[in-house]
């Protein structure tokens, strides 16, 4: 995209956060309701609040941490759920906290620090909650000039060209110092040579790293009716950006990338701005009678695209995708029948009501770019619900066979009623090698970590944390990826617990 086109794109996206988001929440005491529910359901502590802005501790080690495993697991997630007498009305509105689990021959050390966003600073100075969130706005909420005013930097991590970025899907990345986790500030990708900046343009929380080391991402600007596409070079410079008009607009959270295409599923959760809506989420309408649109974009020409259709569905996360020489794309996703887990579950849980929405099952998709057809099929037996899929990073955007994900078996649910198993699933054989966590532990996202010198998808580890609500501790767990069912080969136990987070990245070295 030429510099003039960058300017046009920025002008199109320079629109304020929808005014309807200023409709304020009622006077119900969500903090009190949550505290009361916590007495009956102690596992709700996983959605509690942080008691400080900075945590740091050496971990108590059990088992054997491999000498060749050296690096840092960076994670982020919503952690600041209550401040100044106001409790957020949606899990995704919590102020972000970035974690670093530093793993080396002499042990594991953990550090976590609240991201010092513009929102955090403004509310600290005012001594009260200021900005609207997904589901509601606090009393006396103020208007904003754009999404970055309320950006909590709480969803995912990107480590690219030496920079550590905390991501949120509706605004700019926040740069974090990888050594002490202090906040550098909002980060803006720019053209090579310091050209046009894309500051403030939505940068989704799920970028994809291509085979050449470059990064692809998208963002959605609801008020402008646009999807924005990004291509970031391996050197961190902005190589290209494009846009696609979408009407009606929706809320895509993730996407997949192949050798030649970008693919997004656009659920029929249509943007319908209303002046009296309590929060941005409530400016959307679920239309199950409408199809889920599938947008396919040419990587070499971001203006070239076409749409296909699937039955109505909701997808938070994809595992991976690849494309064969005949132009057939195969990908996988945790597919839910509707967005109730976001619109209901993640709201109700914040006031202590464990009312779980309709969970996702794992599906495989086959998209023929030449015939322009798409089909879908369940990959697991009914009753196995999944989320947080990930893959060996060495096969990102390429042919793959194995997926790591969390799951719950409807026939063997945990006391807390949510995900309680970590899996390594073999697409070709259909084998699911899994470990069931004790009911007192709620697992967070687990990642595949390659063993140095190994072939892709062989000989690696699975690394992930869990919230132990019975002991008030965070536990980092390491599994042998070849024998997941045997349980962790090593653990690192912290003397504190931090509310459940979302996504992370392991950085070797």
Q: Which stretches of residues belong to each language-model region?
A:
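N-terminal export signals
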Residues: 5-25
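Beta-propeller blade signature
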Residues: 228-234, 279-300, 347-369, 420-426, ...
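Well-ordered mid-protein domain cores that form the structural environment of catalytic cofactors
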Residues: 117-239
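Blade-edge beta-strand/turn elements of extracellular beta-propeller
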Residues: 181-193, 232-246, 293-311, 365-383, ...
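Structural signature of eukaryotic scaffold interfaces centered on beta-propeller domains
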Residues: 137, 144-160, 203-211, 256, ...
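Short, conserved, GDST-rich strand-edge loop motifs in beta-rich repeat architectures
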Residues: 83-86, 267-286, 336-356, 408-416, ...
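Substrate-recognition/cap regions that form aromatic- and gly/pro-loop-enriched pockets
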Residues: 377-473
């Amino acid at each position: 995209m030429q510099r003039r086109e960058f300017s046009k794109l920025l002008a199109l996206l320079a629109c304020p956060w929808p005014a309807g988001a200023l409709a304020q929440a009622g006077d119900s005491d969500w903090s009190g309701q949550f505290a009361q529910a916590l007495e009956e359901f102690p596992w709700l502590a996983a959605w509690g609040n942080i008691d400080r802005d900075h945590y740091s501790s050496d971990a108590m080690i059990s088992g054997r941490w491999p000498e060749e495993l050296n690096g840092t697991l960076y994670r982020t997630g919503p952690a600041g759920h209550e401040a100044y007498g106001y409790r957020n009305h949606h899990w995704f509105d919590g102020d972000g906290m970035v974690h670093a689990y530093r793993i080396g021959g002499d042990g594991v050390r953990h550090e976590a620090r609240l991201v010092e966003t513009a929102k955090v600073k403004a509310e600290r100075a005012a001594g009260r909650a200021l900005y609207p969130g997904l589901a509601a706005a606090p009393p006396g909420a103020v208007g904003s000039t754009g999404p970055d005013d309320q950006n909590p930097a709480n969803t995912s991590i990107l480590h690219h060209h030496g920079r550590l970025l905390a991501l949120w899907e509706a605004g700019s990345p926040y740069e974090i110092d990888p050594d002490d986790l202090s906040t550098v500030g909002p980060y803006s990708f720019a053209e090579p040579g310091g050209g046009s900046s894309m500051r403030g343009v939505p940068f989704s929380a799920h970028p994809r790293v291509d085979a050449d080391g470059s990064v692809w991402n998208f963002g959605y600007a609801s008020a402008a009716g646009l999807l924005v596409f990004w291509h970031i070079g391996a050197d961190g410079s902005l190589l290209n950006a494009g846009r696609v008009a979408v009407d009606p607009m929706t809320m895509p959270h993730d996407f997949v990338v192949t050798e030649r295409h970008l693919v997004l599923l656009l659920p029929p959760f249509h943007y319908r701005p209303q002046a009296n809506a309590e929060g941005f989420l409530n400016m959307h309408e679920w239309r199950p009678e409408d199809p889920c649109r599938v947008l396919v974009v040419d990587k070499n020409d971001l203006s070239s695209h076409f749409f296909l259709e699937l039955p109505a569905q909701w997808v938070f996360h994809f595992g991976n995708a690849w494309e064969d020489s005949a132009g057939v794309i195969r990908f996988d996703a945790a597919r839910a029948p509707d967005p109730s887990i976001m619109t209901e579950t993640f709201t109700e849980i914040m006031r202590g009501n464990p009312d779980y929405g309709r969970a996702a099952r794992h599906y495989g998709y086959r998209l023929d770019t030449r015939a322009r057809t798409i089909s879908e099929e369940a990959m697991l037996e009914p009753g196995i619900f999944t989320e947080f899929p990930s893959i060996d990073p060495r096969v990102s955007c390429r042919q793959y066979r194995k997926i790591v994900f969390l799951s719950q078996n409807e026939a063997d649910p945990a006391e807390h009623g949510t995900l309680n198993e970590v899996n390594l699933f073999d697409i070709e054989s259909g084998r699911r090698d899994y470990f069931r966590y004790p009911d007192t532990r709620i697992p967070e996202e687990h990642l595949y970590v390659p063993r140095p010198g190994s072939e892709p998808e062989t000989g690696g580890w699975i690394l992930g944390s869990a919230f132990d609500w019975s002991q008030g501790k965070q536990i980092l767990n390491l599994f042998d990826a070849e024998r997941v069912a045997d349980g962790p080969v090593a653990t690192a136990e912290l003397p504190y617990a931090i509310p459940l987070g979302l996504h992370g990245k392991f950085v070797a070295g």
